[in-house]
Amino acid sequence: MKLQKPKGTQDILPAESAKWQYVEGFAREIFKRYNYAEVRTPIFEHYEVISRSVGDTTDIVTKEMYDFYDKGDRHITLRPEGTAPVVRSYVENKLFAPEVQKPSKFYYMGPMFRYERPQAGRLRQFHQIGVECFGSSNPATDVETIAMAAHFLKEIGIQGVKLHLNTLGNPESRAAYRQALIDYLTPLKETLSKDSQRRLEENPLRVLDSKEKEDKVAVENAPSILDFLDEESQTHFDAVRQMLENLGVDYIIDTNMVRGLDYYNHTIFEFITEIEGNDLTVCAGGRYDGLVAYFGGPETAGFGFGLGVERLLLILEKQGVALPIENALDVYIAVLGDGANVKALELVQALRQQGFKAERDYLNRKLKAQFKSADVFAAKTLITLGESEVESGQVTVKNNQTREEVQVSLETISQNFSEIFEKLGFYTQ
């Protein structure tokens, strides 16, 4: 048997992992500006944490979850999304307590798992970056969170992004709309896809965002949620729209957008961009005011979003956006002869302890091969260390770009390489 990675997974190799680290670091920097702190939850949860919150009839639960019984006969699932685990953690750790500052703002990063047909930007193990804000029903929280997502996408370089906005209203408005949708779709049931015929019975709002051609035709003249909003829901949505306009955030009202999770109410949104003629959602989220109470906590408002790292990187690549990845070595030490082996090890370690990114040769190769390695690593400076340099205590440090050279002592390199580095035209942080 040939041992390979499971279908729908990937190995993120060093050339790619640098991009991942950049995206994750960039997200952390943006989130910190908005006073978010990181939370890390287990990658597996009790089955009910996901099924009851995401919705028993959703595609995620009925078709896509990886679930199993462990050796203690506990029903476990690999997390398919990030919000439910964070809410579970919020309640379990009593972060709703009076002494905890409100609103409570958290972000998370990590792998999620869904049994889907693998395709570009969508894998069975995928990685999500997300945020959750607890304790504020103020529509300004909706807008701040959406604006933070827009801020991140703009700063990282995603082009042509459009914000699609909708509301699901409060439970009363949603229930009224649900019935109106059932009344509209029931006579058309036989024209719907098999999945949407099932959805009509279980979760009729999901028919609205079906990608099947026959379903799109069926919902063309469907009633709009906007016609079923009560005063509270209308006031909240109007405030969100007005504040987005005040911040200069453009949006498109998309009444067919419902999101694939049952816990949403009021504001929902997606950031969408077009790649090769296809609309791709790069970030999505919304408000979920009933989820904390559903997990046994007090009535607590919530708002958040998630974005897929694989899809984000795919879009950046397709749009030709080069991330500013700094992979260059500061110093490469070419080693000539066994007599220089120990000193080279001491020297490269001293450089690293001074904060420089340094490497040396370990393979006793010819100098030409070592110089080629220095070029492959894009080394800024090059030191050639042989037995004669060890004996004299003097060595040549070369600017590997301009070929400028300086003669210095090994002691100076070991103790204060910054001075030499700057003399050769480079700057230390």
From Swiss-Prot:
Coiled coil: none annotated. Keywords: Aminoacyl-tRNA synthetase, ATP-binding, Cytoplasm, Ligase, Nucleotide-binding, Protein biosynthesis. It catalyses: tRNA(His) + L-histidine + ATP = L-histidyl-tRNA(His) + AMP + diphosphate + H(+). The keyword Protein biosynthesis applies. Its EC number is 6.1.1.21. The keyword Lipoprotein does not apply. InterPro entries: aa-tRNA-synth_II, aa-tRNA-synth_II/BPL/LPL, Anticodon-bd, Anticodon-bd_dom_sf, His-tRNA-ligase, HisRS-like_core, HisRS/HisZ, HisRS_anticodon. One of its GO terms (biological process) is histidyl-tRNA aminoacylation. Gene3D superfamilies: Anticodon-binding domain, Bira Bifunctional Protein, Domain 2. Its main location: cytoplasm. GO terms for molecular function: ATP binding; catalytic activity, acting on a protein; histidine-tRNA ligase activity; transferase activity. It is found in: Cytoplasm. Pfam families: HGTP_anticodon, tRNA-synt_His. PROSITE patterns: AA_TRNA_LIGASE_II. One of its GO terms (cellular component) is cytoplasm. Homodimer. Belongs to the class-II aminoacyl-tRNA synthetase family. PANTHER family: HISTIDINE--TRNA LIGASE, MITOCHONDRIAL-RELATED, HISTIDYL-TRNA SYNTHETASE. HAMAP family: His_tRNA_synth. This is Histidine--tRNA ligase. The lineage of its organism: Bacteria, Bacillati, Bacillota, Bacilli, Lactobacillales.
